[in-house]
Swiss-Prot record:
One of its GO terms (biological process) is DNA repair. Belongs to the SOSS-C family. InterPro entries: SOSSC. This is SOSS complex subunit C homolog. GO terms for cellular component: nucleoplasm; SOSS complex. PANTHER family: SOSS COMPLEX SUBUNIT C. It comes from Drosophila mojavensis (Fruit fly). The lineage of its organism: Eukaryota, Metazoa, Ecdysozoa, Arthropoda, Hexapoda. Pfam families: SOSSC.
Length: 115
């Protein structure tokens, strides 16, 4: 790799590097905003969540006595899991309990006898 010999070449190299970083930053910011607009993937066998349940979860009081705002955690979680959630009152700030389905273990085939 050749190094610039004069301060003018050094300044030009620094300017190009900064421009490249700025364009990459703008690209990443643009990708981040479109990723937030994409819907979450839906899984097969996912239970439906009623509006009443969402209201119960969002109105659960937290340890400070105020209304917790679990909706920011509840929505992405409920859209990406096979389980469901039960609202609860908690002094620790846990506004809902996850309930996951019990899956039966896959039977393993018997090992062949080697003689």
């Amino acid at each position: 790799m050749a190094f610039p010999t004069s301060s003018a070449q050094q300044a030009e190299t620094n300017r190009k590097i900064l421009e490249e970083i700025q364009t990459k930053k703008q690209l990443l910011i643009g990708l981040g905003s479109t990723a937030n607009q994409m819907p979450a993937p839906q899984l097969l066998g996912q239970p439906t969540v009623t509006a009443e349940f969402v209201q119960n979860v969002s109105a659960t009081p937290n340890a400070a006595g105020g209304i917790a705002a679990p909706r920011s955690a509840f929505n992405p979680t409920s859209s990406t899991t096979l389980g469901f959630f039960i609202p609860q009152d908690s002094y620790f700030g846990n506004s809902f309990i996850p309930v996951l389905p019990r899956l039966e273990p896959v039977p393993t085939p018997p090992a062949p006898n080697s003689k």
